[in-house]
């Protein structure tokens, strides 16, 4: 059997190599999309639970609506807080690249060695403002 016809993980489409990183702008769009969907899901679940509680009057529905409200509040506050940090860093022209796989709340890195104290303060203040 020739080398070209041998089946290996690389030729099967499964590679053990590190995936190619997306450009910063594409990772920003991916993070915005993921966070937008998380916001939409949180608000939708809370609204559905609240509508159920209001129309049924069940204590279970009211309890679930309350739990959904706290969950939605936490998700919304976290996302706005992190985007505030990101906005503060970018306004100050900080070296703040997007993370390789922006799927969680944290969407960018801040390099303390490459940034000034003023850039750090701008990034820091952005979180509570968001």
State where each predicted segment sits.
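Metalloprotease/metallohydrolase-associated module, dominated by Zn2+-dependent proteases
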Residues: 2-53, 108-130
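Small-residue-rich helix-interface/hinge motifs
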Residues: 68-120
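Hydrophobic alpha-helical transmembrane segments
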Residues: 59-69
């Amino acid at each position: 059997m020739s080398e070209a016809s041998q089946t290996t993980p690389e030729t099967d489409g499964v590679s053990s190599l590190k995936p190619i990183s997306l450009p910063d702008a594409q990772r920003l769009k991916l993070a915005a999309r993921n966070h937008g969907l998380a916001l939409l899901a949180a608000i939708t679940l809370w609204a559905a639970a609240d509508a159920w509680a209001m129309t049924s009057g069940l204590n279970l529905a009211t309890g679930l609506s309350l739990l959904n409200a706290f969950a939605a509040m936490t998700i919304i506050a976290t996302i706005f807080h992190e985007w505030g940090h990101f906005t503060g860093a970018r306004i100050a022209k900080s070296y703040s690249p997007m993370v390789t796989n922006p799927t969680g709340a944290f969407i960018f890195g801040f390099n303390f060695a490459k940034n000034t104290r003023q850039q750090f303060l701008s990034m820091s203040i952005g979180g509570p403002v968001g």
